[in-house]
A protein has these predicted regions:
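Non-catalytic, solvent-exposed segments at the cell envelope interface
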Residues: 1-309
Length: 309
């Protein structure tokens, strides 16, 4: 575990942008249902009471290129975020995409398949039943969603400590042939990344000496960089960003809650109050069916109940 500000970096900006970009309100319980309404203007954020109670959000990221059927994609990134406004604490739990788990749709498989079988409702129900937590909302972003978010804020700046050299990066933004590979190289030192290069930086799974831990750290680094740029946004900027992003994000967070989260977001900037949990050994180990990761659920649940009471 380590205290990293990256955990919250994407959460609030994504909520603000997603509700404008998709105009979708999705009821999490008992079953997600899409409700459509016109894209709101910056002045349409309703006045809301401050958020005082703790809440938990599931962040989901997917490869949604043309190899996959719409809404039947895997979730390569699953991050559980708990925010406690009274103490200004944020806790993140990165869930291994290959974790062997009991899916809410039935049977056992890698946990990243829950979304493909039943959408956000199945992903939420799976995490709730296996980890013993309650999830209030979710945010989902696809490949183009991440690219468009970063491009809409003018790119991001990162300092790369571990260079990335990946000869087997999937060339899945190539709509004519999304099955090929390409070389991705990110050198050490300061880098300004546009949306495509930032996506490559966080998704690359090969050539990092720290393996999956390095990938998780890169994801958090990019989230922090997004947060730094998004902090400069005001509600007046959101309609233009919505037009740029299109419908590449989905969320269950309604307008009233977004309005209440705006002042809260500004107060959650203390890195010492933001914690990241990564389920490395002894919490998990390899050797599961179909290349999955096996969880030591006794240890996992003890940890989860400590940070997600």
């Amino acid at each position: 575990m380590s205290g990293l500000a990256g955990g919250l970096a994407y959460f609030i900006p994504a909520a603000e942008i997603a509700i404008n970009a998709t105009s979708q309100v999705i009821r999490v319980t008992p079953s997600p249902t899409l409700l459509f309404s016109p894209t709101p203007s910056a002045s349409s954020f309703p006045t809301a009471s401050p958020v005082t109670g703790a809440f938990t959000v599931l962040l989901l990221g997917s490869d949604d290129d043309s190899k996959f059927s719409p809404d039947h994609v895997l979730t390569q990134s699953m991050i559980l975020v708990r925010v406690v406004p009274s103490t200004k604490e944020v806790t993140m739990l990165s869930i291994p995409r290959d974790l062997y788990a009991h899916l809410s749709t039935g049977g056992y498989a890698k946990i990243d398949g829950a979304y493909s079988y039943g959408g956000p409702g199945a992903a939420i129900a799976t995490v709730e039943q296996d980890f013993g937590v309650h999830i209030d909302d979710y945010i989902w972003v696809g490949l183009l969603g991440l690219v468009k978010v970063i491009d809409a804020i003018g790119g991001i700046d990162v300092v790369t400590s571990n260079p990335v050299m990946d000869d087997y990066y999937p060339a899945d933004l190539n709509t004519s042939w999304p099955y090929g590979f390409q070389r991705v190289a990110v050198l050490a030192g300061p880098q300004h990344l546009d949306g495509v290069h930032a996506m490559q930086y966080v998704r690359s799974r090969h050539g990092d000496l720290q393996s999956d831990l390095g990938r998780s750290q890169r994801q958090q680094q990019v989230l922090l960089a997004i947060r730094q740029k998004a902090k400069q946004l005001s509600p007046a900027d959101l309609p233009a960003m919505s037009a740029a992003i299109g419908g590449e994000l989905k969320t269950s967070i309604g307008l009233s809650k977004v309005g209440a989260l705006l002042p809260l977001a500004a107060s959650l900037d203390n890195p010492e109050q933001i914690h990241q949990i990564v389920l490395l050994p002894p919490y998990t180990h390899g050797g599961g069916p179909d290349g999955s990761v096996v969880g030591n659920w006794n240890l996992i649940l003890q940890l989860v109940h400590q940070y997600f009471p």
